[in-house]
Amino acid sequence: MIDSIHVSQAGVEGPSPWWLKGGAIFIGVLGLLSLLNAVSLALGGIAMDAMMGEMDPEEICAEDEDTEECEDFIESIAQFSSMPLWDIGAAFSALLFLLSIPTTILLWNAEDRDMALKFAWGWVFVHAFSQFYITHEFLEWYGTFFDSIPIEDFQWLTQFTSFLSYGGVLMCELTLAAGLVLISYKTRPPTKLEAPSAFHVNNE
C-alpha cells in the first residue's frame, strides 16, 4: 500500500540550453541568407530598371506580325521591373536580418527564455508575412504575364503554379513554427515535484 510520495529536496535539473542554442544557430543562418536576399533583390531591381530603360517596345515590335501582342508582352515585362516587390522584398529581408541579430544572441545566451522565444516568434511571423507577400505579388504579375502570351489554355498552369507556390510557403512556415513549438516545449521550466516511482514509494 502506498503511504507517501517522496519529494526530492535536491534541485531539479533544468532543460538543456542546447535547444535554444540550436534555434539560435538556425535563425542565425537564415538571417545571413536574408541579408544575401536583400542585396540580390536590391541589385536585381536596379538591373531590371536599367534593362527596361534601354528597351523601346515600338522599336522591338516594329517587324513583328502582331505588333499589339508583342507590345503587350514587353509591357508585362516592364511591369515586372517596376513592381514594388523588389524594394519591399529587399526591405523585408533586411528587417529579417536585423531582427535575427538580437534573436540569435538571446537564444544563444539562453538566460532569458521567455524574451528569447518572443523574439523568435516575432522573427517567424515577419518571415511568414514577407514570404506570403512576395509570393502573392509575384503570382499577380505571373497571371498578367501569361495573359499577354497569345497561347490558349494556360489558365491551368497559373492555377497549378499558385497552388504549388502558396503550398510551399505554407509548409515552410509551418515547419519553422513546429520547430519553435518543440523548442518551447523542451525548454519549459521544470517542476520540483517528481513523479512517483518504485524508488520513491515507502511501504510500511
Regions found by a protein language model. Name each.
Residues 2-204:
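Topology signature of small-to-medium multi-pass alpha-helical membrane proteins
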